[in-house]
Design a protein with these regions (language model features):
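Extended beta-strand/beta-hairpin segments
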Residues: 1-64, 72-173
């Protein structure tokens, strides 16, 4: 049996106002996500569902969680493979279908990582060879991502061509 990890978060509704849920349009969807010892995340519903567009919504946070998990595993495999990643940006996106009855589900999330690599170490120096090497690291990251392994919809990875760091350059982003 594997090692179990447990996670806890408090979600606190802050949008009751004076009327609470006396009507569908009467209450705010604003809430806070609190985890002990960490900054509070101000959250709401997606604006399509009467949420505050200035706050994070659960759908965005799910897409972000998938992108973060993939990135962290990718960085792990890059480090253990001798590939010096110096920049990583993912412009991830998800698609959710909502049925006429109001229920819905994600149909897919697409991760679009852009990786900047420092030449040397075990990194390939040819563009195509480096892209193939990084594709293998992305494959391994996807296979290990706890969150991607926990969802029922496809999580696709469409990496951009790798960027080789040039002298004096910073990271991707």
């Amino acid at each position: 049996m594997g090692l179990l990890h447990e996670y806890a978060a408090d979600v606190v509704w802050t949008g009751a106002g004076a009327t609470g849920t006396t009507g569908y349009a009467a209450y705010s969807r604003d809430h806070e996500v609190r985890v002990a010892g960490k900054p509070t995340v101000l959250a709401s519903a997606d604006p399509a569902f009467r949420g505050d567009p200035a706050r994070h919504n659960p759908e965005e946070l799910l897409v972000a969680a998938l992108a973060e998990c993939h990135m962290l595993w990718f960085l792990h495999f890059a480090a253990t493979s001798g590939v010096a990643v110096v920049g990583y940006t993912d412009r991830a996106g998800g698609t959710m279908r909502v049925e006429a009855a109001g229920h819905g589900q994600f149909t897919q999330v697409v991760l679009r990582p852009q990786v900047t690599v420092r030449p040397g170490g075990s990194a390939a120096t040819d563009g195509a060879a480096l892209d193939a090497q990084l594709a293998d690291l992305h494959r391994r990251a996807h296979e290990h991502c706890f969150i991607a392994r926990s969802v029922t919809f496809p999580v696709l990875t469409e990496p951009a061509p790798a960027v080789l760091e040039t002298a004096g350059a910073g990271s991707a982003g």
